[in-house]
Amino acid sequence: MTIGPRVYLLDIEGTTSPVSVVSEQLFPYARKHLEAYLRDHWSEAETQADLSLLIEENRLESDEKQILRFAQDHKISAQDDKASGIGEQSIAETEIDSVIAYLLWLMDRDRKSTALKSLQGRIWKSGYEAGELVGTVFPDVAEAFERWSKTAKVAIYSSGSVEAQKLIFRYSSAGDLTPFISAYFDTRTGAKTSPASYRAIAEQVQAAPKSILFISDLVRELDPAREAGCMTRLSVREGNQPVPDENGHTQIQSFAEID
């Protein structure tokens, strides 16, 4: 008798959902509503926490011009506040302009910024709750989640924030799928291109790496997962980028192919 995986670890883009959902729906929505969201929620603790993380990330920025631009804007606004006694709202407006410019710069380059992903997640939350967004999933996803969850754990690992992941499956085109999902992981766990990230996930789900099946549409993510000891499957969905014929991973076109 063949024993199946104890954990089904899944990517989102190109695996559970079409790649186009993120690039053509979610990203444009976050970009369109970024400024309004920041201005409406600037003083909230979550936004300030993201801003603090953004500043820390910026200090490690490899593009020196962006480091200087963002850091100088932030420093100047604080100095102006202290020297002239300008009210908090005026200072916030100055800082928001700097933050928006840097966030748009990150978006344009598809940077995997944890602070950006967190902000995007909350913007999307507003969209889902307003009925303006729907988490599109492939037709085979719901059945597979229900089937797998009866004998194993279903977990998600995406570069999008955990909050954003939960929204996709809570407001999915197949209904609320969150009851079938045991755990969510994002870049706070580590880069998807690092074997250490998959070992960390194995510890958190309390399963040996060899009992975890990771499914993704990207070979550069599957390789480190396999190096960590995980089983792998390459998701080949409509709209995905072409993959090399000799990639070393078993290919699937539907979750129905996996027991």
Where are each of the predicted segments found?
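Asp-based, Mg2+/Mn2+-dependent phosphohydrolase catalytic module
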Residues: 1-3, 179-259
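Basic/polar N-terminal segments that are highly enriched at the extreme N-terminus
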Residues: 1-5, 72, 84-89, 256-259
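Asp-based phosphoryl-transfer active-site loop
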Residues: 3-22
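Short His-Asn-centered micro-motif
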Residues: 10, 157-160, 187, 215-217
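Short catalytic/ligand-binding loop motif for oxyanion handling, primarily in non-cytosolic enzymes
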Residues: 16-20, 163-166, 223, 241-242
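Conserved phosphoryl-transfer catalytic core
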Residues: 22-104
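Phosphate/adenylate-binding glycine loop and adjacent helical scaffold
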Residues: 110, 114-120
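Substrate-recognition element of Asp-dependent hydrolases with the DxDx(T/V) motif
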Residues: 118-122, 130-172
